[in-house]
Amino acid sequence: MLDTSFIIDLFKNPDRVKKYFSLIDKEGACLTSISYFEIFRAKRFMSKREISYFNQLFSAYPVYTFDLEASEKASEIWIKLERLGETVSVLDVMIGGIMLANGVDKIITRDRNFQTMSKVVDIEAIIV
């Protein structure tokens, strides 16, 4: 899974993330509808080049959505984190739910919220 922060780095700082390309080639990549929302909510500030880049990227990889199964998994993550007294962005918990619902166990990200989530669910956060 490619998190929003990594997706943005692909466009803005490709040199920063190029060392992860072999992992992506080896294991594949997928995206989420949450990341699409996070990126395109700023569409009015984006150049045509950025819009085109991100549209092509989201067309090139599978995009998993926040369906009922993902909602259930996200709720479970949220409850487990609450019990530990941990707070994580609701959008990141939704991405975590999507991961679990689709059998995805790794995410490439700059966001340490996924490391926090890995305390309560079996996901690996690969921090850029």
Labelled PLM ranges:
Residues 1-31, 41-56:
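Short, well-structured N-terminal submotif of metal-dependent ribonuclease cores
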Residues 2-3, 32, 88-89, 111, ...:
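Histidine- and aromatic-rich ligand-binding microenvironments
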Residues 3-4, 39, 74, 99:
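Generic structural signal for small/hydrophobic residues in well-ordered secondary structure
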Residues 6-7, 35, 70, 94-95, ...:
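Alpha-helix capping/helix-boundary segments
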Residues 17, 36, 51-54, 71-74, ...:
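A general structural signal for well-ordered alpha-helical segments in protein cores
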Residues 47-50, 81-82, 124-127:
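Short, hinge-like loop/turn segments at secondary-structure boundaries
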Residues 102-128:
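Acidic, PIN/NYN-like endoribonuclease modules and their adjacent C-terminal/linker elements
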